[in-house]
Amino acid sequence: MAKQDLILLHAPSVYDFRKEFLFYGPVSDLVPSTPVFEMYPFGFMTIAAHLQSNGYKVRIVNLASMMLNDSDMDVDSFLAKLDADVFGIDLHWLPHAQGSLEVAKLLRSIHPQSKLLFGGYSSTYYHDELIRYPQVDLVMRGDSTEVPMLKLMAALENDRDLHDVPNLSWK
């Protein structure tokens, strides 16, 4: 697979929901999704479009949906085939914190040189806690982060100081 500058990856609510019996609580009537939360946030598309229009290679991977549709999918092998400087994982809703953090652990073990970035509503609220996890390098805070994401990608590409990137927590 061609190398990407950024892969935006949507994890399932629980990793690995295919191997464990879990009792799921109710899902909002407003969000047409199963308890696996297979719908990625709309912001993935706006961030990807903005970065692509500025010359970056961006791919969206809906891992939750892929796993839901293929019970035999080998997640480790699939993730190993991906190649990106940065993997962005959404933590939009708190119920999918476990899945996002576990997939980030897998990515860290498979791609130790790549940066792991979290974003979304819950990431914003819990950025101080998230950044303490060893598998989390960066947290983009806020909504409508297309401009800060562009600044982040440019800073990483040019090995510049991250202090000038708005809305960013890092270690």
PLM features per residue range, with description:
Residues A2-Q4, D85:
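Nucleotide donor/acceptor-binding cores
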Residues A11-P12, Y40-P41, H127:
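Proline-rich low-complexity regions
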Residues F23-V27, P41-M45, L101:
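Short amphipathic alpha-helical segment that frequently serves as the phosphate-/nucleotide-binding helix
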Residues P32-H50:
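A structural preference for long, well-packed, hydrophobic secondary-structure segments
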Residues G43, H50-K171:
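Glycine-rich beta-alpha loop elements in corrinoid/cobalamin-binding modules
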